[in-house]
């Protein structure tokens, strides 16, 4: 398939060549376009600019027009001549071998195709012949240098590819030419646009420009460059508000350019990237000046960044700031002097073709004969950089030929050289040229660097300043931003955004199709904005919190009722005092156990009551400090059980007094049965056992455990136990309420008992304090769930225990210690007799 495709291509080439043959021969030419040698190199240079017009016939354009001379191409033309002469004069490179050349002016696509076919012509002939094996093709040149732009290079590379003839371009930078399947013989000494596009995007990012316009020139260079820029910039957060291509035949101010300027103005972008060749760029910027598009930042691609074409546009100084990417500045030593000597040598009219020789079309430069040392084209920085690329390209071919001919021994072998053999060697070259390494990767691309430049209008004439550099593989920018003179006030960096950045903690809500246009919304509480994802708020971790509109999460404060907090110290002191009073009362009652006061209070039953209050008091210590499993298991159940035992004893004590004084004579059988069967003890045991069963069920089914509570307060972690408001807790509490009511009823029935046995008021006070304390606790727990809730629980428990102690035991302690005269049998008998008389009178 490839064989027939190659033959089809050759047939087409032959046909075109024959169609042009009769119109291509010249009778005169300029000296310097050809040089005989052992091996010939071809060079394609644009000594004249093409006339941009539509052609209807495939005729070769005559480049030698008086109004189209291209000084830049002239310098590159001279650079190749100079380099070949320098190599021929060298004894280290290609000794005993002389290089020659054939140079062509390729001002148009047709002249470029013609020159390429001339290069492919068989050695010793002026035409191509059909061949079965292209590997044996022997053309009169072994390699080709050029051409100067992507469009021409694509054509030339496609024609040379079947023959594998090396094509080393000095200015064609399009990434499409790196494809080795289509262009296996293409190499270049200018970096690929792949890197240029990366450098431009990095340049935009370094200044925070995310809202841009893209303009390209018609053709592969501009259109592919704009496409690559958009594809690379969009994933990096840069939005393209406007994109267009300058038409091939456009003129400044024509309707098409006016529409483009209008759309560019409406895009409201401060930064415009112009990826264009220097020829169409002039049309674009003349239109920019006519439309008065000022105050912008223009980013230049390397083809026009330091070209003198654009600065010569009238009014260009007012368009704004121009930054650009340029090939690294290098000098070709001796080139300027070489051009001056050439001018002196060719001064005069073109020569006539020698009889019998072939002078190819577009090997003529009439302007070159009119130059003097005073009016010759100025060799500026732009042309010098490109000339160095030509210099490097010729040296790369020479080194490849040096290796192929085995010249390392001091002499070179002579014999036929096929282009494909030379191509293999050129890929392998690796040498130093004026301290710069020359080598190619597997795609034929060189090692290289870019300069970052800024235009400077401070002086009387246009200049540019190198403000930074860009290294490749990987791409790295180094920019001195202080060197840039911005067009805005106070030399401030212009801003180019659709929407200004949101405040910290505000995420972007995209509006429309461009992600650079958005509204700013605050992040909700508990979320934060991560700088790596500006469109979505991220939730904080479990142990973290964030207020509304936050850019970071903060660690939650862990809170619990600590031992050393002021409120804890107060409660601990009060509870310890109560505990000491309970123990002291137990000791006092043991000392005065057989006195009437202790016996009337219940005798030995008082120790059970005091012990239950001590258990409840001890349980309150487990509310302080970090909750632990033992503390959670003991604190509420132990308190509840202790107070239940106390209430059971208090209830049965009140009930016994009522039976003794009111029902012993009325219902003697019940009284004797109750007394003989130890009814009081049975009741206390049964009641306590029931409550113990409830507590065990509570612990088994709703086991209190330490937990970290995150929901109540966004910025806090509350360490607590899970027993609060659990079903087990409420059931146990309900049992205590039932006992409290029973105690109140029994004490109320005994309100008319003898004074020393009438405890209705004291018991009522104790129970009232109990009810009020726990009502206050449940009310507080329903509205407050903070770290001080255990303190409220302790306070409620302390009030309950204090109420029980002060209501029942404290009056008796007072009598024992302060009124011993009332603690005797006679006083109690008198009180009973008084009660009997009152009952008898009623």
Curated annotation (Swiss-Prot):
Extracellular face residues: 20-568, 626-640, 703-725, 784-789
Effect listed in the UniProt record for changing residue 281 to A: In strain: 129/J
Tissue expression as described in the entry: Expressed strongly only in fungiform papillae.
Major subcellular site: membrane
Alphabetical list of Pfam families matching this protein: 7tm_3, ANF_receptor, NCD3G
Source domain of life: Eukaryota
Membrane topology: Multi-pass membrane protein
GO biological process: sensory perception of taste
Record localization: Cell membrane
Listed Gene3D superfamilies: 3.40.50.2300, GPCR, family 3, nine cysteines domain
Span of the signal peptide: 1-19
Phenotype for residue 418 to Y: In strain: 129/J
Keyword hit for Signal: yes
This protein's UniProt keywords: Cell membrane, G-protein coupled receptor, Glycoprotein, Membrane, Receptor, Sensory transduction, Signal, Taste, Transducer, Transmembrane, Transmembrane helix
One MF term in the entry's GO annotations: G protein-coupled receptor activity
Any one cellular-component term (Gene Ontology): plasma membrane
All ranges on the Cytoplasmic side of the membrane: 590-604, 662-681, 747-762, 811-842
Keyword Cytoplasm attributed: no
Known glycosylation sites: 88-89, 96, 136, 292, 480, 530
Protein family: Belongs to the G-protein coupled receptor 3 family. TAS1R subfamily.
Quaternary structure and interacting proteins, as annotated: Forms heterodimers with TAS1R3.
Protein name: Taste receptor type 1 member 1
UniProt source species: Mus musculus (Mouse)
């Amino acid at each position: 398939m490839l064989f027939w495709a190659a033959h089809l291509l050759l047939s087409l080439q032959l046909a075109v060549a024959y169609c042009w043959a009769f119109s291509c021969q010249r009778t005169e030419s300029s000296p310097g376009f050809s040089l005989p040698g052992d091996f010939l190199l071809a060079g394609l240079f644009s000594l004249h600019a093409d006339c941009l017009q539509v052609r209807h016939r495939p005729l070769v354009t005559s480049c030698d027009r008086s109004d189209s001379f291209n000084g830049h191409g002239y310098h590159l033309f001279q650079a190749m001549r100079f380099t070949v002469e320098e190599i021929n004069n060298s004894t280290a490179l290609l000794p005993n071998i002389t290089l020659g050349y054939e140079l062509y002016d390729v001002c148009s696509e047709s002249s470029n195709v013609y020159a390429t076919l001339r290069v492919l012509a068989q050695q010793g002939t002026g035409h191509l012949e059909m061949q079965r094996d292209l590997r044996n093709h022997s053309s009169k040149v072994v390699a080709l240098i050029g051409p100067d732009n992507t469009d021409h290079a694509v054509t030339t590379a496609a024609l040379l590819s079947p023959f594998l003839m090396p094509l080393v371009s000095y200015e064609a930078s399009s990434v499409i030419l790196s494809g080795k399947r289509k262009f296996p013989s293409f190499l270049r000494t200018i970096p690929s646009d792949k890197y240029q596009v990366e450098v431009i995007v990095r340049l935009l990012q370094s200044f925070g420009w995310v809202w841009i316009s893209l303009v390209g020139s018609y053709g592969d260079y501009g259109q592919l460059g704009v496409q690559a820029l958009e594809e690379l910039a969009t994933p990096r957060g840069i939005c393209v508000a406007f994109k267009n291509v300058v038409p091939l035949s456009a003129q400044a101010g024509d309707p098409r350019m006016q529409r483009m300027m209008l759309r560019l103005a409406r895009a409201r972008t401060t930064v415009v990237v112009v990826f264009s060749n220097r020829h169409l760029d002039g049309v674009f910027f003349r239109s920019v000046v006519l439309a008065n598009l000022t105050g912008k930042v223009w980013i230049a691609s390397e083809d026009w960044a330091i070209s003198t074409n654009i600065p010569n546009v009238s009014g260009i100084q007012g368009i704004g700031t121009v930054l650009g990417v340029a090939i690294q500045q290098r000098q070709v030593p001796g080139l300027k002097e070489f051009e001056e000597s050439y001018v002196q040598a060719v001064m005069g009219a073109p020569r006539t073709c020698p009889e019998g020789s072939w002078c190819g079309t577009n090997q003529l430069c009439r302007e070159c004969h009119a130059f003097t040392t005073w009016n010759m084209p100025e060799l500026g920085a732009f042309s010098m950089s490109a000339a160095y690329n030509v210099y490097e390209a010729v040296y790369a071919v020479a080194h490849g030929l040096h290796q192929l001919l085995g010249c390392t021994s001091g002499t070179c072998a002579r014999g036929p050289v096929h282009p494909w053999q030379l191509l293999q060697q050129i890929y392998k070259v690796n040498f130093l040229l004026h301290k710069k390494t020359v080598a190619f990767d597997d795609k034929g691309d060189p090692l290289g660097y870019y300069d970052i430049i800024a235009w400077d209008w401070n002086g009387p004439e246009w200049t540019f300043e190198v403000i930074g550099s860009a290294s490749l593989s990987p791409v790295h920018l180094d920019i001195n931003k202080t060197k840039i003179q911005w067009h805005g006030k106070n030399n401030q960096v212009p801003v180019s955004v659709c929407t200004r950045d949101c405040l910290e903690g505000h995420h972007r809500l995209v509006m429309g199709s461009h992600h650079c246009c958005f509204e700013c919304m605050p992040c909700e509480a508990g979320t934060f904005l991560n700088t790596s994802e500006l469109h979505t708020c991220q939730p904080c971790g479990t142990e973290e919190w964030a207020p509304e509109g936050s850019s970071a999460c903060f660690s939650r404060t862990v809170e619990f009722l600590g031992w050393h907090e002021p409120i804890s110290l107060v409660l601990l002191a009060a509870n310890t005092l109560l505990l000491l009073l309970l123990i002291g009362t137990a000791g006092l009652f043991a000392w005065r156990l057989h006195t009437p006061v202790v016996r009337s209070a219940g005798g030995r039953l008082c120790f059970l009551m005091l012990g239950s209050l001590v258990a409840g008091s001890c349980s309150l210590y487990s509310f302080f400090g970090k909750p632990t499993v033992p503390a959670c298991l003991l604190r509420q159940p132990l308190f509840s059980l202790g107070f239940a035992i106390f209430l059971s004893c208090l209830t049965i004590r009140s009930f016994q007094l009522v039976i003794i004084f009111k029902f012993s004579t009325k219902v003697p059988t019940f009284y004797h049965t109750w007394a003989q069967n130890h009814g009081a003890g049975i009741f206390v045991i049964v009641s306590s056992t029931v409550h113990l069963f409830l507590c065990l069920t509570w612990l088994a089914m709703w086991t209190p455990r330490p937990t970290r509570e995150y929901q109540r307060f966004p910025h806090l972690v509350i360490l607590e136990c899970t027993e609060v408001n659990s079903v087990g807790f409420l059931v146990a509490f309900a049992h205590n309420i039932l006992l409290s009511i029973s105690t109140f009823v029994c004490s109320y029935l005994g309100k008319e008992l003898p004074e020393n046995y009438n405890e209705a008021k004291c018991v009522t006070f104790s129970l009232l304090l109990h009810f009020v304390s726990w009502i206050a606790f449940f009310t507080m727990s329903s509205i407050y769930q903070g770290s001080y809730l255990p303190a409220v629980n302790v306070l409620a428990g302390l009030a309950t225990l204090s109420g029980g102690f002060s209501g029942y035991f404290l009056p008796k302690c007072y009598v024992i210690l302060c009124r011993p005269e009332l603690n005797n049998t006679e006083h109690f008998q008198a009180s009973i007799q008084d009660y009997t008389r009152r009952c008898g009178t009623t």
